[in-house]
């Protein structure tokens, strides 16, 4: 997964 995707998943 892309770093941006990981950040969005953790941000939720």
Swiss-Prot record:
Expressed by the skin glands. GO terms for cellular component: extracellular region. It comes from the Eukaryota. Keywords: Amidation, Amphibian defense peptide, Antibiotic, Antimicrobial, Secreted. One of its GO terms (biological process) is defense response to bacterium. Its main location: secreted. The keyword Secreted applies. It is found in: Secreted. The modification Lysine amide is found at residue 12. Belongs to the frog skin active peptide (FSAP) family. Hyposin subfamily. Has antimicrobial activity. This is Hyposin-H4. It comes from Pithecopus azureus (Orange-legged monkey tree frog). The lineage of its organism: Eukaryota, Metazoa, Chordata, Craniata, Vertebrata.
